[in-house]
Amino acid sequence: MADPVEDIIGDYRAFVAQQRDRLATRGIDITPYPLSHLAYRVPEWYQYVHVRGLLERHAIANPENVWNGRPMSLILLEQPLEVLGGAFVPLIELIPPVHQRVYKMGLEHLGVVVGDGVDEFSRVHRRSLTGQQFQNAHNEPYYVLFEDFTHVKFHRRSLREVVELQGARFDGFHHVEDWVPQRIVTATGPNPLPR
């Protein structure tokens, strides 16, 4: 059976399995935890708009908003993606061209919901973690950065819950209007990603 989301973002099952296996070699087992989201990055604005349109065909909501000076889509899928033999990913964070450093284009990170035990989790796994991001009062994930510039982020709350705490609603499709993209060179250069 065809998987239209896989056709758009690539083999997300293999990506999640790879991240799980990499974490296991570092002594971190993510199987007990729910999954928040997958992040997918594109190097050019026109690709962002195109991929957003394709993904929204398989979604029920996208409260797109501006974060760090550029639009960001939070695409709530009509059917969550099944991964790891029974875990589900309900949301795709679609991220336009980068704002500050080198990032992996395509499938870039997996969000894992550790819950209120996330600080204890960080103490237990301190040697395996790369750092912590301070995004806002509701979202300060710990993360592991791998050599290929992909990540796994460990959250107190799912990305959907964070966005709802900030006042957004997943009630249809809302896009940022009148935003003008900046020209930024990414780690993949000015050329599009290979297909």
Question: What residue ranges belong to the model's regions?
Answer:
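Glyoxalase I/VOC metalloenzyme domain signal
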Residues: 1-36, 40-69, 75-195
